[in-house]
Amino acid sequence: MPIRVPDELPAVNFLREENVFVMTTSRASGQEIRPLKVLILNLMPKKIETENQFLRLLSNSPLQVDIQLLRIDSRESRNTPAEHLNNFYCNFEDIQEQNFDGLIVTGAPLGLVEFNDVAYWPQIKQVLEWSKDHVTSTLFVCWAVQAALNILYGIPKQTRTDKLSGVYEHHILHPHALLTRGFDDSFLAPHSRYADFPAALIRDYTDLEILAETEEGDAYLFASKDKRIAFVTGHPEYDAQTLAQEYFRDVEAGLDPDVPYNYFPHNDPQNKPRASWRSHGNLLFTNWLNYYVYQITPYDLRHMNPTLD
């Protein structure tokens, strides 16, 4: 949250030079506050587990957030009870006339599926096009990043030969960027993907600013300069056991997966893994809610014209 200080305090300009968000008394006096409306397009099979992961991170902010869950796949789910979907999820037709402060598009286990073979690919394109006029800021996670880069920038699907699975080190490129505010210079985050995100590709074919990348030169966190779209290629929302569950699932399926990198103590799957990315995940989502949503969204959502003073 911003700090509130008198307009004339010398610290105002000093802190702003470091890109610290300072709210002057004159601006604060005219600021109205309401709950933020955040839409979550949940593409993961185990929807309840995914809900828990994202809501845990969103709840770590002092901001009040109203959550709406969205589904676009009408097929019967094998992993989530129909009663749960009917009670807690809406269809796109239910909300297409509404506006939202934020939208989160989750990952999906579709890394080896061509875009046009995804059953709900037309609906994904519809939601992304709709979000341009109805959402202040959208956050794409893992597979959704790949889908958005294709739809919004025409970047072809980039696929790794082997699945990237484990907990990897990253470093920030812009220490004073709002989305990385408070990040350590280097930090850990989990990945579980076939999608490939070379930083050079993002720089060459988009106007997006890369804010953090892996030690191997893959883009991890990047965003548009107007803060309307942000991308995270890993899974900072994952629980401590999620990578283990995926690993043992693949073992049982006879896929002979590699042991997730830097995850199990002593690289032994019989050891209980520890989460080393919780603080990063919480800070990332808090920064997104504050700087990319709350600070630029209009008070009256009927008039969508996000700006940042």
Swiss-Prot record:
Catalytic activity of the protein: L-homoserine + succinyl-CoA = O-succinyl-L-homoserine + CoA
Keyword annotations from UniProtKB, A to Z: Acyltransferase, Amino-acid biosynthesis, Cytoplasm, Methionine biosynthesis, Transferase
Record site: Important for substrate specificity: 192
Pfam families to which the protein is assigned, alphabetical: HTS (PF04204)
Site location (Important for acyl-CoA specificity): 111
Highest taxon of source: Bacteria
Major place of residence: cytoplasm
Subcellular location: Cytoplasm
CDD domains: GATase1_HTS (cd03131)
Gene Ontology CC terms, in alphabetical order: cytoplasm
InterPro entries per the UniProt record, alphabetical: Class_I_gatase-like (IPR029062), HST_MetA (IPR005697), MetA_family (IPR033752)
Disulfide bonding pattern of the chain: none
Entry annotation: catalytic residues: 142 (acyl-thioester intermediate), 235 (proton acceptor), 237
Binding site for substrate: 163, 192, 249
Pathway listed: Amino-acid biosynthesis; L-methionine biosynthesis via de novo pathway; O-succinyl-L-homoserine from L-homoserine: step 1/1
GO MF annotation terms: homoserine O-acetyltransferase activity; homoserine O-succinyltransferase activity
Biological processes per GO annotation: L-methionine biosynthetic process from homoserine via O-succinyl-L-homoserine and cystathionine
EC numbers on record: 2.3.1.46
PANTHER family found in the cross-reference section: HOMOSERINE O-SUCCINYLTRANSFERASE
Quaternary organization: Homodimer.
Task of the protein: Transfers a succinyl group from succinyl-CoA to L-homoserine, forming succinyl-L-homoserine.
Matches recorded under HAMAP family: MetA_acyltransf
Family: Belongs to the MetA family.
Protein name: Homoserine O-succinyltransferase
Species this chain originates from: Shigella sonnei (strain Ss046)
Gene of this entry: metAS
